[in-house]
Amino acid sequence: MAIKYRIKCPQCGEVLNTYHDTQCPKCRNNLYVNQPAMLQLYRKGNFYGFAGAFGIYINGQPYGHIGNKESLIFPLPYGTYNLHIAVGVSRKCNDLLFTLTPETPRMYAKTYIKPGFWTNSFGIEVATPDEMPND
């Protein structure tokens, strides 16, 4: 199975997964996966059994959730982005700031939970294409 694209409708804000160009189910706006740049995010599997979905925020805007061992592609225009991961009320995360340009149109990142003594936090690291799953 191919990796899903995660698209946010610029007209109504609806977030959806797709494998190809589609229409927003809420407002019928045309949505395209072919953007000049992209972020591929992989959530590493968790030994501790924490399989709840992680909330994804790009530039403070919600982009849905990512499940355990899931990989998603976010088609994005060129620009600077802040990636933040959170679950429920736990917002402790080392955000990833990245810029997509014609020279660097792709960003690969992996996220995981970092168990702590009192509370858990979330890690996000830059990754290489070789670290990304193929399906």
Predicted segments, located by residue:
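Short loop/turn and low-complexity linker motifs enriched in small/turn-promoting residues
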Residues: 1-135
